[in-house]
Amino acid sequence: QLNYVHDSKEVSTPILETLEALAGIQNSGKIRHFGLSNETPWGTMRFLHYSETQQLPRAVSIQNPYNLLNRTFEIGLAEIAHREQVGLLAYSPLAFGALSGKYLQGNQPENARLTLYSRFVRYKKGHAENAIQSYVDLAQENGLDPTQMALAYVSSRHFLTSNIIGATSMEQLKTNLISSELELSEELLEGIEKIHGLYTNPCP
């Protein structure tokens, strides 16, 4: 069982103090391992430094956003995840469903996440829609469902441990699961990189 505890109000606890508290929890048998979330390269390396020098528990994963519209994890953290064996648990791999293309041209599907939670405006700003349309077109040109291409891309990254999918219907779940069987061609990956070069991380 994997549980992540989120406390947006607590951001000032020193890293060493956090690790010492986690050591006590681990020694009591309440947890086996722990992971980080929304951490920076510097913060991740400080956790690993204290774990090594103070003989404290070591982070085994990092849960950060990663998708075709937000690949900022690749800037520093991807190398750490790979070389230090702190694998990425990628959340929001579909960018709140935006990479399905269902919000293009101002569409607001009933009960869809960005329809219900209008405060998440990052997927409607700047070059976001241009990037989404480009990825949707690329997928369709290659006979793929845009959702499945987006998920398959995330799953193909060497620094990934788990792709955290989300679904509100059985149809969505089935579509998502099919992506685990896809292997993207070199030509398709080159197409993705071309779009990324034009619209680099429009939704960080």
Regions found by a protein language model. Give the residues of each.
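Conserved short secondary-structure transition element at the edge of the structured enzyme core
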Residues: 26, 115, 121-181
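Glycine-rich beta-alpha junction loops
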Residues: 40, 66-70, 92-99, 153, ...
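Generic structural signal for well-ordered alpha-helices
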Residues: 19-23, 41-48, 78, 132, ...
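Conserved, mostly hydrophobic/aromatic
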Residues: 34, 62, 81, 88-91, ...
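Glycine/proline-rich, positively charged
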Residues: 1-63
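Short, hinge-like loop/turn segments at secondary-structure boundaries
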Residues: 51-55, 78-80, 105-109, 180-182
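Basic phosphate/pyrophosphate-binding loop/patch that engages nucleotide-derived ligands
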Residues: 26-27, 72-87
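Glycine-rich, positively charged active-site loop/lid region within alpha/beta enzyme cores that binds
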Residues: 1-4, 80-138, 204
